[in-house]
Amino acid sequence: MVVVRRLRQSLVDEYGKEIYSLLKSFADVIGYSFEDEEEIKIEFNPDRPDLFSIPTLVGAAKIFYYNEPIVRSLFQASEIEVAISEGVSFIRPYFAGFVAEGPSIGSKLDDLIDYQEIIHQTVGKERKKVSIGIHDLDKTEPPFRYTTISKLERMKTYDSFEGTIEDVLQKHPKGMAYSSLLPDSRRVPAILDKNGGILSVPPIVNGIMTKIEPETRKFFVDITGMDSNSVKYAFYLLANFFQSSKYRISLPKIKGSYGPSKKEILDFNFRPYRLNLKYVSRYLGDKVSEENVILNLRKMGYVAEPGYPEVMVYVPGFRVDVMGLVDIIEDFIKSYGIENVREQYVSPGTIGSPNIFNEIKEKIRDVVVGLGFQEVMTFVLTGKYYQEDFQGEVRIENPKSEDYSVIRDRLYLNLLDLLARNKKHPLPQRIFEIGDVIVHGKQETHLCVMVEDNRSGVSTSKSILTSFLKRFSDHESKISGKKIYGCIEGRSGEIFLSGKSIGVIGEVHPSTLENFGLVNPISFFEINIQELIDQHQ
């Protein structure tokens, strides 16, 4: 989740009293949470990065409620030049940039810096794919160069840390956090001005020379990265912030660019889609008029033009979340109002019957509850703790958050994370989960039973496993010693039923407990329910 904060009085002072109620109502349309305190807290799902700042959110709300038209504005050409050195192609090859000119940034400075960091975390994947530098153009002199420089060069960072770039990488907080994104080399990427002054060392830190202040009116924004599309997305998100704040955007002349090209950037803005009204009606379950579709899409920030039986829809560049017609229809329904969608009774063509697999899962659930355990549910998508030994083979290609970047391949790590989040509860903690995982590309349903107690060892889970199997299966079980990821060697093993492997059992290693911030002993067993059912039948 992405959180945006602003003092309520500051919001009212800048945008007027009506904007407060406007944003509160807009939450029901978009689907964000709005916490009404002295400091307003707005919490978003990660699917609308164009709204993750107060100026862009206010702009979208005004378009929706005041029917302010979207202008298909074109970027102007700037006389500023940026030369791209061939050396950066091996380190951080992609570059885009723009110039923004307008009023003094004033109180929006904090909004801008917060939005920059949000883009770093979301689109930029913690600066791995994209990093952004924002500079006061009046404090420097173009043309600029995106090139490489020696780590022995000296610089002064935006917060007055002074030393060699090597010092910055090793001692400055930003350097220590992000130096791993650069290859082990004697040179680093840098953006220099006409006189060789260092504007920034991407993706690490900006120099003090072009530090932005509330009085700044002219900005030069550099966007560098490892992924061309991500650089393009960040370009439009930042450009939208400035345009929402009444700034003019112009594009510098890029020499030697490795992409995205100027044409790629311009073509992404107001990209066209043909939306058939029958297609909309099929999703809505009711007939809609061309006028209705156009009105509601314009309220959601699209350019929509008649062309019966199709509507021509042009998607602004900052709507990086829109990947096809279904996304456009979803926005139409949000504007149309989900409460206005007519309910219909769909008569089933068959007679229902219980799913046998689900019935057996219920029996398993009853048995484990009877053994004194509480059921929990964790996310199928995960990522944070799968740095080693990941066997799922299913990763999200473009995750909104690295914490939800893979489909889990086991349950016990998720349960450890859950226990770590509930340390305030008294011991013992006896929990279980029945859930889907993917192992080596195959979907399986697992049962994981876990005990946290000051005396919990593998023998604890072994006795629980024995009791469980006796209540559910008459077949002979056996545990064969095996090293299990995250467990103590010699206190973990593989579970066999009638000679066939059905799961694993183990006592969690102290180092694993430490990684999760846990201190008490934990043991568990995890079995494949399908294998258990096959033995049961």
UniProtKB/Swiss-Prot annotation:
Subcellular location: Cytoplasm
Domain B5 stretches: 268-343
Coiled coil: none
Enzyme class: ligase
SMART domains the record matches: B3_4, B5
GO cellular component: phenylalanine-tRNA ligase complex
InterPro entries reported in the protein's UniProt record: aa-tRNA-synth_II/BPL/LPL, B3/B4_tRNA-bd, DNA-bd_dom_put_sf, Phe-tRNA-ligase_IIc_bsu, Phe-tRNA-synth_IIc_bsu_arc_euk, Phe-tRNA_synthase-like_B3/B4, Phe_tRNA_ligase_beta2_arc, PheRS_beta_core
Positions bound to Mg(2+): 321, 327, 330-331
EC code: 6.1.1.20
Keywords: Aminoacyl-tRNA synthetase, ATP-binding, Cytoplasm, Ligase, Magnesium, Metal-binding, Nucleotide-binding, Protein biosynthesis
Molecular function (Gene Ontology), one example: ATP binding
Cofactors (names): Mg(2+)
GO terms under biological process: phenylalanyl-tRNA aminoacylation
Main location, first listed in the record: cytoplasm
Family in the record: Belongs to the phenylalanyl-tRNA synthetase beta subunit family. Type 2 subfamily.
Protein known as: Phenylalanine--tRNA ligase beta subunit
Organism: Thermoplasma volcanium (strain ATCC 51530 / DSM 4299 / JCM 9571 / NBRC 15438 / GSS1)
Gene: pheT
